């Protein structure tokens, strides 16, 4: 259920956007099948809420969402009010296996750490540009340009601001 609904068929398995080791711009809520019959079974077992995350193929796999176990027609009507998004991160075996088998980085734990460092350095620079722009007066904003929007960096900046929580599978020392 969640990003892997049941009954499971390959066309409905949307847990990993395994096209790049860093996919912070994807959101699990866009892959949830709200008609999944497993929700009703879980409710019968007393499960009233879920935190649904992307899979663990990527270093940074995207945003997770908290939902109430209600039978609804849209994911927005299931979202838990005011629950923060989370960011799924994985390091170690899964990213090594997925990308190493393709002869692509990361293929080692060193590659995992390097991918994290690169992403967080870029996110901090993006956040600095946003903060510099926001600190300008309204007049200065009118004659200047806002930083170009970057959906991947927006998610990582949200983590740096403390607005998005991190869920990390297989923590390594970096």
Segments and roles (model prediction):
Residues 173-174:
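Conserved small/polar residues in nucleotide/adenosyl-binding loops
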